[in-house]
């Protein structure tokens, strides 16, 4: 199997062309490939498939290192877009793809930056999914060690965002797993911890479901900014600093799609026997 190793701000991926190759990924194969000591090593496996809809260019599949399939990965989407252009699978710079839960528009820029139309944030609890009677800007979520005030949103995958005073000393190693598997999230959740610098600048760390804390989480950055705007503490254009680097997020509010812009880096190509 031919593959490419890529990363978006340190969030690393193996990207596989399933348009010109016949590939199949059982859970045990994904886990073996994800092993950083005995396999290739990655946060997520991204698979480029032929479009399910003739009006689209590709279908985009995402698997976590534990073998679970998820419906969204913003950093992965940027790498996906660069991959299909680099490999000559398309000559378009505006690429339309489907995911397990919707559609995305990806725009490859000349400076290796990619802008992703992430769609409109989803706030209805039953669509996230999140166990709550109605939408609220802030939810009280109780864990074994702490009661938290959180914003909850879906960017195609569920996110729980908590504001912290100091991102470096936030108790993410403990709170991340507790939120990820909290009973109010039937499909588990990505837990984001946001420090607000000013109305146009935040720092963020994300504990991703199925992957743990990563260097960067694109959909997590989108979720944090959307929550901050909804809560009235952020403006419409926000710089997000993650451990792996910087993303720019723009959202004009309800009724509008959210845009994420950031780097997508190709590291190397390889061949492995499955």
Swiss-Prot record:
One of its GO terms (molecular function) is diaminopimelate epimerase activity. The keyword Cytoplasm applies. Its EC number is 5.1.1.7. The keyword Isomerase applies. It is found in: Cytoplasm. GO terms for cellular component: cytosol. It holds the Pfam family DAP_epimerase. The active site is at 73 (proton donor), 217 (proton acceptor). The record marks 268 as: Important for dimerization. It catalyses: (2S,6S)-2,6-diaminopimelate = meso-2,6-diaminopimelate. Keywords: Amino-acid biosynthesis, Cytoplasm, Isomerase, Lysine biosynthesis. PANTHER family: DIAMINOPIMELATE EPIMERASE, DIAMINOPIMELATE EPIMERASE, CHLOROPLASTIC. NCBIfam families: DapF. Homodimer. This is Diaminopimelate epimerase. It comes from Histophilus somni (strain 129Pt).
